[in-house]
Swiss-Prot record:
GO molecular function, one term: FMN binding
Chain residues that bind FMN: R125, A126, S127, G277, K292, P293, I294, P295, S296, R318
Protein origin, superkingdom: Bacteria
Sequence positions that bind NADP(+): R48
CC cofactor note: Reduced FMN (FMNH(2)).
Protein known as: Chorismate synthase
Protein purpose: This reaction introduces a second double bond into the aromatic ring system.
CDD domains the UniProt entry points to: Chorismate_synthase
Assembly, per entry: Homotetramer.
Alphabetical list of InterPro entries matching this protein: Chorismate_synth, Chorismate_synth_AroC_sf, Chorismate_synthase_CS
GO BP: any one term: amino acid biosynthetic process
Length: 354
């Protein structure tokens, strides 16, 4: 299997499966002298840890990270940064039936078609648990970005078709579902309970914002900043669509409305989402990701077995009702990883000033 590395100069390579011994990764290309310790990474991992909310699986994983290399006396050394997290609450017996059956909405069929073999325990490498390594790597990227005044935040703007108002984005991280709207939380909680009782699941929309990004990041033509960000977000298994700025709403606007007037202090509006011509323009980068419902539902489903014979399937095991809120720090991490890479590329390739 290839495709386990993201980035050119700031590179994350990940490893591990849902029910294997553990998961982890290696960051290569991080400059020396960045303040970093296990606590910095742990704070981000705790935001996506299972069992922490009403929509989450009951699987209890402490997700304690160990830094194996690349950090000395609280700062990065410029060498590869390796980290590892052990799996401790696997229950592989729940997955015995799907060794021969394909779960609708999962990667079981396509992994078999590609590799001829698959780790059926919890989805193996295709499990959402794989994103743990992304969050750990993203925490390191955020430490680098912070030195340059760049911050990334993410929050839920819609769950199960019920939107949130952007009332208090700053406080979203402290609320259930990372909601920017205190008044919508109860409705979301009620909906999760109802859908869970029906044996079903929910999707939603997550918004990611990056502030302090200087103008000039992005490498046209094929490495446009928005293209690489969309690539990174779409690499997360549950994401089925990405918008930048006004996104699909721009298709319903006139040019006179969509254009962002330029004033001495910057841009008067931000329909472009902070990116023009694939290059950051100094405004806040605004992204939205459409998150599909979790495919593991507590209902009988129609499928086939490995021999192509029709079958019925009822999925056991412990599963999220929604990828939200646990996917929120994942999307923040992916955005940070791309920005860290683009920042280093810009520093290397920038034209010297006279």
């Amino acid at each position: 299997m290839s495709g386990n590395t993201l980035g050119r100069l700031f590179r994350l390579t990940t490893y591990g499966e849902s029910h294997g011994a553990g998961l982890g990764g290696v960051i290569d290309g991080c400059p020396a002298g960045i303040a970093l310790d296990e606590a910095v990474i742990q704070r981000e991992l705790d935001l996506r840890r299972p069992g922490g909310n009403s929509a989450s699986t009951t699987r209890q994983e402490p997700d304690r990270v160990r830094l194996l290399s690349g950090v000395f006396e609280g700062v990065t050394t410029g060498t590869p940064i390796a980290f590892h997290v052990e799996n401790v609450d696997q229950r592989s017996r729940d997955y015995g039936e799907i060794a021969r059956l394909y779960r609708p909405g999962h990667a079981d069929f396509t992994y078999d078609a590609k590799f001829g073999v698959r780790d059926y325990r919890g989805g193996g490498r295709a499990s959402g648990r794989e994103t743990l390594s992304r969050v750990a790597g993203g925490a390191i990227a955020q430490a680098l970005l912070a030195r340059h005044g760049i911050a990334v935040r993410a929050f839920t703007v819609e769950l199960g078709g019920v939107p949130a108002d952007l009332v208090d984005v700053a406080g979203a991280q402290l609320r259930p579902f990372f909601s920017p709207d205190p008044d919508v939380v109860e409705a979301w909680e009620d909906m999760v309970r109802t859908v869970k009782g029906e044996g079903d699941t929910l999707g939603g929309i997550v918004q990611v914002e990056a502030t302090g990004v200087p103008a000039g990041l992005g490498e046209p033509v094929f490495d446009k900043l928005d293209a690489v960000l969309a690539y990174a977000l779409m690499s997360v298994g549950a994401v089925k669509g990405v918008e930048v700025g006004a996104g699909f709403e721009a298709a319903r606007m006139h040019g006179s409305d969509n254009n962002d007037p330029i004033v001495p202090s910057g841009f008067f509006t931000n329909h472009a989402g902070g990116i023009l011509g694939g290059i950051s323009n100094g405004e806040t980068i605004v992204l939205r990701a459409a998150v599909k419902p979790i495919p593991s539902i507590a209902q009988e489903q129609i499928t086939i077995d490995r021999d192509g014979k029709p079958s019925a399937l009822f999925i056991a095991g412990r599963h999220d009702i929604s990828a939200i809120p646990r996917i929120v720090p994942v999307l923040k991490a992916m955005t940070a990883l791309v920005l860290a890479d683009m920042l280093l590329m810009q520093r290397r390739m920038a034209t010297p000033q006279p």
